Amino acid sequence: MSLMRISTGKRGEELAAAYLAEAGYRIVERNYRCIFGEIDIVAEEGETLVFVEVKSRRSEAYGDPQLAVGYEKQKKISRIAMHYLEEKRLRRRPARFDVVAVKLLPAGHRVELIRNAFELTCG
């Protein structure tokens, strides 16, 4: 992975976490890792546990960042979320999946929150 891609991802995650905190979310964990992969942000909004995937782009050439969260990515995030809920003994806790799309453009950055971006995908 190139340094530019890593810095784009890190910058996007920083902006996303700040945006979520300002929107009333409480950040519980960042970059939660398990054997199935990583979730960018785990947060709480009220009683709901929110698993957040952050997608960042430095250009609009490849389309909107949130379009990168396709079915296979949703399955992977779902598997990681299930592992998290089991590990933390939170299986009965209401949970959902949000996506934060961050555009890091020369004219400035834009952050878009998509609540309930997808359902639990186990296929």
Model-inferred region functions:
Residues 87-123:
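Domain-level recognition of nuclease-like catalytic cores that cleave nucleotide substrates
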Residues 26, 49, 94:
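Hydrophobic "anchor" residues on beta-strands that sit immediately upstream
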Residues 1-30:
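Acidic-basic catalytic patches of nuclease active cores, encompassing PD-(D/E)XK
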Residues 20, 39-65, 69, 77:
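Conserved catalytic cores of phosphodiester-cleaving nucleases, focusing on short active-site segments
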